[in-house]
Amino acid sequence: MVKGVETKTIVGLEVGTSKVVVVVGEVFPDGVVNVLGVGSCPSKGIDRGSITDLDAVVGSIQRAIEAAESMADCQIMSVTLAITGEHIQSLNESGFVPIAESEVTQEEIDSALHTASSIKLPEGLSLLHVIPQEYAVDRQMNIKNPLGLQGVRLKAQVHLIACHQDWQNNLKKAVERCGLQVDKVVFSGFAATHSVLTEDEKDLGVCLIDFGAGTMNVMVYTNGALRFSKVIPYAGNIVTNDIAHACTISRAEAERIKVNYASAFYPARLHGDKKIEVASIGGRAPRSLTKSDLSLITSARYTELLGVVKDELDKLKAELEAKHIKFELIAGVVITGGGAQIEDLKECASNVFHCQVRIASPLNITGLTDYVNRPQYSTVVGLLQYNYSNSDDDLISGSDDSEGTFFESIWQGVKKIVNKVRSEF
């Protein structure tokens, strides 16, 4: 008997460049995800977050949804949707409000966050996330929770993530054409942080690389707060193209060879002399090459891709240190996503970043763990954890009228001070 999804059950949907993935699960009070169903199918009609064929995307989503419904024995009505692409932009902002009653209230915290998020975004962009970093009360800095503290002025520091409205609308349209409602839209990289990073790693300083087929999502935490997020529009598909061009083979054959035999280190550390038979195009006779020969092609590109991330980290370090902010990634680099499964990637990354590296799969999962205990499921599992533990919807809901939000926050603070003065006379 098919049953409807209960309210406590959450469905995550990721429409990636290479695959569409759906996970049905419930999140326990301790944050553990109980996986009830999984659906996955090759993705068509989308490239690096941009829809190129709406009908093809709809068909891919429907197949993945049907597979998840069959496994979970339920009917999916709504989803939490992941979004990525080079249109994603982020920045750090701050907002100030006066403290009316000398003691910080929750309303004043919310007002400070609203003020910080009320900047005028470039035309076409829509705010996705308002993520608090820390607060300051007068000269007391680096406060994680200012509630109840005494002072005159409250400052909120936040990390903002925005996306292009048209890209988001097109992706939502594809989902809605499948008869589904979109509950929330979440940046893929931010979702992945919920499933693979520990609080200790965030406190010590860590860089997460969500390595996909079309994009790499880069997230940097220091002192427990998200400081940097960026989408790099190059990833695993470039390696596939390199193999196809070097060996004069189809992209499908190149992808098969990459997944089964590629190494990110030269020479390949395991079975380097293994012969690989390559199916040529145009009726030509098959050829063969060794695994080490292949690694000469692939290792150079993986080193280059990770080097792009290293350059971003170097720029971030310089910017923060110019502001006298200490930048240390004591917990190193964590790599997840489908591209993280390439052999020897950990060793390659260690050479590039000169720090400890961890290849990560989703943490805190139970139920059908055999299906999702792999790096390519980190984002979609993270969607469930984000949906359960986060709600910045209230902060975002008023962000379209940024001017109104700003002056409303100031006016509310002024009214409180005036009322306090009146009460004393």
Swiss-Prot record:
Mode of membrane association: Peripheral membrane protein
Pfam families: FtsA, SHS2_FTSA
Keywords: Cell cycle, Cell division, Cell inner membrane, Cell membrane, Membrane
UniProt keyword annotation of Protein transport present: no
Highest taxon in the source lineage: Bacteria
Summary of the function given for this chain in its UniProt record: Cell division protein that is involved in the assembly of the Z ring. May serve as a membrane anchor for the Z ring.
Subunit structure of this chain's protein: Self-interacts. Interacts with FtsZ.
Protein name per its UniProtKB record: Cell division protein FtsA
Organism of this sequence: Haemophilus influenzae (strain ATCC 51907 / DSM 11121 / KW20 / Rd)
Name of the gene: ftsA
